[in-house]
Amino acid sequence: MSKTRNGLIEHCKSKLGTPYVFGAKGEILTQAVLDRLARENPGTYTSAYKAKAAKYIGRRCLDCSGLISDYTGRIRGSYNYHDTAVERVSINHLDESMIGWALWKPGHIGVYIGDGYCIEAKGINYGTIRSKVSATPWQKVLKLCDIDYTADQAPVTYHEGFQPAADGQRWWYQYSDGSYA
């Protein structure tokens, strides 16, 4: 079964309110998992950070890339998502055709859900939230390699009848199946 843009968006919406713990990819946080994450990320896991994270023991937790990895089943970090993206576009070119694409800046990733909003696992003090795209200094929009962006596109509708040619001087007849004469 393919992973689609709509599926990714629905997954992200279902994770709103999920606690953020750096390195977590959707698993239930246990003391053993917390200890492993602290060993793997000693620069992040200060004693204060560990104390905050310990409050989430027994709950499913995510970090920013874990929000996406939990849906795709492929563990990647934010830089890996950037490097494996099918397309990378400047954030200045974000438009509504990019719903379900990832928003990226060095060290952080979120998912564009449309109308100027994204869902991101923002940090241990915020958790997984819906936020305005303009509230974070995103740099790029990424078309993710693990998502099928064609599966849930609306079908193309052709209108049967005469259509003007590009030169504006001739006409052609288009059938409802898209063929023409």
Predicted features, each with a name:
Residues K105-I109, A166-G168:
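Short, repeating "repeat-unit edge" segments in beta-repeat architectures
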Residues A151-A181:
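Extracellular adhesion/carbohydrate-binding repeat motifs centered on closely spaced tryptophans
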Residues Y20-F22, Y112, Y173:
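Aromatic side chains
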Residues W104, V141, Q174-Y175:
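Enriched - but not universal
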Residues M1-S65, S69-R74, P106-H108, I119-N125, ...:
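N-terminal capping segments
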Residues E27-T30, D70, G114, G127, ...:
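Intrinsically disordered, low-complexity, compositionally biased regions/tails
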Residues M1-T18, R76-E96, G107-Y158:
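Aromatic- and glycine-rich peptidoglycan recognition patches
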Residues S97-W101:
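Loop/turn positions that initiate beta-strands
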